[in-house]
């Protein structure tokens, strides 16, 4: 285990103690909700251009290197790691012994070493606090977080004044100049996404919940498409809101908490999230008024304001943080063109096609430097920034799991209909999407009459309880059908161009869209 020398070392403090330290250190203030409110300066989201993976003998042929998985040499990593250790040796540091992964076979022990008390609280909220000594002889991973230390691109071989470096061979994650806490959780997500496929576990960027009878649903999607909102269901039990593994026998959470977007949060629309933001939680870049009351509609600091809280703040939760293999899988896509249906039933080949495509929108992007507003994107596996291996590795595992369980996969559009974004279209309301999700989870949607949507070749229901029938076929929601056809053809062409890069069996390629008739 890595030995950390520091001026003062605080080990395994309670959340209350970490909050006291954070306030005393001037890292944040207590809000009217009781949650700790912090700001992160210019870095209010992930910094994908500053994320690196050490390229060595073990990883050279296993990682899909490129703009997302940028290589860095072992020597460069070692030098920066040593610099971070020297920097922290002159300061008080906070250390917590945690774990990622709620499955006894696949969890990783994790030692989190942070300069900021609130970063350690974040780790305690988001990762899993083990009961007793649960390491089972497994070697521990180490996160080293030094946000006050800045990098020099010329000296340190990086791109800016901050860097995230993942060393898969040495079980180390280094964060320098990175005050945005989400970098810690996404770094460990990337680690699990690399480690688990060889163990026949599909890692997923998805939320998961369970019904009264134990039936499990998965919600895949990029940030802002509805994973956290739709999985926080008042009639179901939450497993997790963001990162899970699907083994031959179960679905299990990687985390022990939630990291919810706060922009425009309302008690009426999202009561479970609203009520979870209390003492023990963290509000990141949420604007407070002079009385410490959060204004969730104020995007002055960022569109990507966040709340981190432990699962224990959600009353309806699955206690052991895992469930059986899923009965329903939902791909949440936010279609800006307004041409996709609110729900479609996918074959396993279509599931692989849309999983690899990952078509959606960047809604209030989580990335630093992103264009304000909304733009469409193709994000492989509904989470391209977090998957180190080639995308087909994950797609093949997904198809294997679908075949083994027979679970139904659905494409659910949480975006626009009746026209494109900014061109007369309207976004599906949360109540409409919830009604669709309820129809999916009841099992009734797949039993009713269906039709095929031309061009996309998607099987869509003719009726769904609680949803206006005319909304189910997007072609019928446009006043000008020829305008719909033209817009649909444009999106179909984008799908085809994006898919050219994948080497897949013909059955998967042919499951994609064809020309509009």
Curated annotation (Swiss-Prot):
SUPFAM superfamilies reported in the protein's UniProt record: PEP carboxykinase N-terminal domain (SSF68923), PEP carboxykinase-like (SSF53795)
Reaction(s) the record says it catalyses: oxaloacetate + ATP = phosphoenolpyruvate + ADP + CO2
GO biological process annotation, one example: gluconeogenesis
Name of the molecule in the record: Phosphoenolpyruvate carboxykinase (ATP)
Keyword Oxidoreductase: no
Metabolic or biological pathway: Carbohydrate biosynthesis; gluconeogenesis
Free-text cofactor note: Binds 1 Mn(2+) ion per subunit.
Cellular component GO terms held in the UniProt record: cytosol
Domain of life (superkingdom): Bacteria
């Amino acid at each position: 285990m890595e030995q950390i020398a520091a001026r003062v070392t605080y080990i395994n403090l309670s959340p209350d103690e970490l909050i006291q330290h954070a306030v005393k250190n001037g890292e944040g203030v207590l809000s009217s909700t009781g949650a700790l409110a912090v700001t992160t300066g210019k870095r209010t989201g992930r910094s994908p251009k500053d994320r690196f993976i050490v390229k060595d003998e073990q990883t050279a042929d296993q990682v899909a290197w490129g703009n997302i998985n940028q290589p860095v040499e072992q020597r460069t990593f070692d030098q920066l790691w040593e610099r971070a250790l020297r920097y922290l040796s002159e300061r008080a540091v906070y250390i917590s012994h945690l774990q990622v992964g709620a499955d006894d076979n696949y969890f990783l022990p994790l030692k989190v070493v942070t300069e900021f008390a609130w970063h350690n609280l974040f780790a305690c909220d988001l990762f899993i606090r083990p009961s007793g000594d649960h390491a089972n002889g497994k070697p521990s991973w180490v996160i080293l977080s030094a946000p006050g230390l800045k990098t020099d691109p010329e000296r340190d071989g990086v791109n800016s004044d901050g860097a995230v470096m993942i060393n898969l061979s040495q079980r180390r994650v280094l964060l320098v100049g990175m005050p945005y806490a989400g970098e810690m959780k996404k770094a460990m997500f990337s680690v699990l996404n690399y480690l688990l496929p060889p163990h026949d576990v599909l890692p997923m960027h998805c939320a998961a919940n369970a019904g009264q009878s134990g039936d499990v649903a998965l919600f895949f999607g990029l940030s802002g498409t509805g994973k956290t909102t739709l999985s926080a269901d008042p009639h179901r039990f939450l497993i997790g809101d963001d990162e899970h593994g699907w083994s031959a026998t179960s679905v299990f959470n990687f985390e022990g908490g939630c990291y919810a977007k706060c922009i425009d949060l309302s008690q009426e629309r999202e009561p479970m999230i609203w009520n979870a933001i209390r003492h023990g939680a963290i509000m990141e870049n949420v604007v407070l008024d002079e009385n410490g009351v959060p204004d969730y509609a104020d995007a002055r600091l960022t569109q990507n304001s966040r709340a981190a809280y432990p699962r224990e703040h959600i009353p309806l939760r699955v206690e052991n943080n895992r469930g059986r293999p899923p009965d329903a899988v939902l791909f949440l896509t936010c279609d800006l063109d307004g041409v996709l249906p609110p729900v479609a039933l996918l074959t396993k080949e279509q599931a692989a096609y849309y999983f690899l495509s990952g078509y959606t929108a960047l809604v209030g992007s989580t990335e630093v430097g992103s264009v304000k507003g909304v733009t469409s994107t193709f994000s492989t596996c509904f989470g391209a920034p977090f998957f180190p291996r080639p995308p087909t590795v994950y797609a093949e595992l997904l198809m294997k799991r679908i075949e083994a369980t027979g679970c139904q996969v659905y494409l659910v559009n949480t975006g626009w209909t009746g026209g494109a974004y900014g061109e007369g279209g309207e976004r599906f309301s949360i109540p409409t999407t919830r009604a669709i999700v309820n129809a999916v989870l009841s099992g009734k949607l797949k039993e009713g009459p269906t039709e095929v949507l031309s061009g996309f070749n998607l099987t869509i229901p003719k009726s769904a309880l609680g949803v206006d029938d005319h909304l189910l076929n997007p072609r019928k929601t446009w006043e000008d059908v020829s305008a719909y056809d033209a817009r649909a053809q444009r999106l179909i062409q984008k799908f085809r161009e994006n898919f050219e890069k994948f080497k897949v069996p013909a059955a998967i390629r042919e499951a994609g869209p064809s020309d509009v008739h």
